[in-house]
């Protein structure tokens, strides 16, 4: 690029994944470790006009579910990400039952915990896997991370009767997580407490969940 925005953006990107890893690192620096990031955009495998291609990539770190009172924490694994990927491909009306998972994913993935997704012997639909530990270390990331990439232009879309959905408006406010403790009568159901919290501001409060319960005299 002859006039880059910064010294770190002098070359056209060959993949979206490094940008997602950088975003994840910035989030971890701010104390956010359960992350679901994605981007859809152009990447480049050369300097010619025809070397541009479209990709959709996702990155997942941390626990599969947030803190809650019903089940222990569990770190995201390969099969969780595979489920997300197949769900996305299904929504794109891709021929799921004709896809195959094979070795030889890019080197930024773990060699034994990654795969390329193919349709037939030649058409590459995408990639999936655990990010290599050395890559995570270079970005200063803690814990494991999994990613996937889809190449929409390679998918032979099937017919769909679904109607288009309107894009959600993205808030211009930074996210903020808070833990609160309430002392309530044991007859009050948790749904009533959650509903009361949501009613304070339905636009700004995105999610409310119960992550622990203390009962009896020891709770005071």
Model-found features: residue ranges?
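Extended, well-folded interaction surfaces typified by the phenylalanyl-tRNA synthetase beta subunit core
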Residues: 1-38
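Generic, well-ordered alpha-helical scaffold segments in large soluble proteins
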Residues: 4, 19, 23-27, 43, ...
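Electropositive phosphate-/nucleotide-binding environments in soluble metabolic enzymes
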Residues: 14, 18, 52, 79
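Short acidic, glycine-rich loop/turn motifs
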Residues: 28, 45, 117-121
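A carboxyl-terminal module marker
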Residues: 37, 51, 65, 69-220
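Conserved catalytic motifs of ABC-family nucleotide-binding domains
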Residues: 58
């Amino acid at each position: 690029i002859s006039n880059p925005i910064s010294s770190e953006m002098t070359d056209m990107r060959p993949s979206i994944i490094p940008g997602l890893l950088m975003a994840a690192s910035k989030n971890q620096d701010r104390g956010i470790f359960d992350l679901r990031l994605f981007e859809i955009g152009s990447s480049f495998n050369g300097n010619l006009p025809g070397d541009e291609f479209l990709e959709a990539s996702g990155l997942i770190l941390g626990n599969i579910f947030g803190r809650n009172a019903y089940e222990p924490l569990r770190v995201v694994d390969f099969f969780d990400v595979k489920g997300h990927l197949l769900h996305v491909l299904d929504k794109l009306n891709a021929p799921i039952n004709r896809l195959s998972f094979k070795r030889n994913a890019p080197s930024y993935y773990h060699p034994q915990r990654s795969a390329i997704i193919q349709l037939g012997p030649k058409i590459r639909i995408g990639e999936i896997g655990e990010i290599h530990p050395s890559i995570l270390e270079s970005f200063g990331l803690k814990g494991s991370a999994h990613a996937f990439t889809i190449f929409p232009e390679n998918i032979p879309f099937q017919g769909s009767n679904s109607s288009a959905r309107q894009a959600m408006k993205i808030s211009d406010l930074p996210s903020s997580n808070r833990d609160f403790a309430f002392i309530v009568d044991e007859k009050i159901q948790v749904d009533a407490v959650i509903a009361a919290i949501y009613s304070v501001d339905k636009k700004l409060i995105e999610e409310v969940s119960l992550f622990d319960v203390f009962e009896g005299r020891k709770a005071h």
